Amino acid sequence: MPYTDHFRLADDYISHLDKVMDTIGDPFIKSRYSGFLAISAVTVYELALKNVFIDFANQTHHMLGVFTANFFDRINGRIRVREIKEKYIQNFGDKYLRSFADGINRCEEEILRNEGSSVISCYENIITWRNSFAHEGRLPDTCTYE
């Protein structure tokens, strides 16, 4: 499945939730939906990340693709920006590490300039929320559906 298809699945889920969330009066139930959305978001990011790495490796060499698929089989949400750089991209060499860092920095600067928020902080927060909800059944106060 192309990595973009994973995002379409999440977009469909969010479209459904947009219609439902305003009808929920119970803050506890609303927080449960937010927690499940955080889990879904990180799952989508993880699947997309796996697809990008595996597709790249398969284009390079079939055996590298097999190795990469096995390597990424159990990353289980370990997809923070630092982990992507240090545990995953670094294995492919400095050229790709620099390219990733440049791309992330350009995106971060553009979003900060146009939206006034950090895409990296937002991304990291979603992972934190997912971990809190998945492992402890609770969400930080900073996590809301809005």
Role assignments for model-derived ranges:
Residues M1-F36:
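Charged alpha-helical initiation segments
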Residues I14-M21, A48, R130, A134-G137:
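A structural signal for well-ordered alpha-helices, especially hydrophobic packing surfaces
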Residues D22-D26, F53, A57, R138, ...:
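Short, flexible helix-adjacent loops and helix caps
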Residues S31-A57:
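Short, hydrophobic, well-ordered secondary-structure elements
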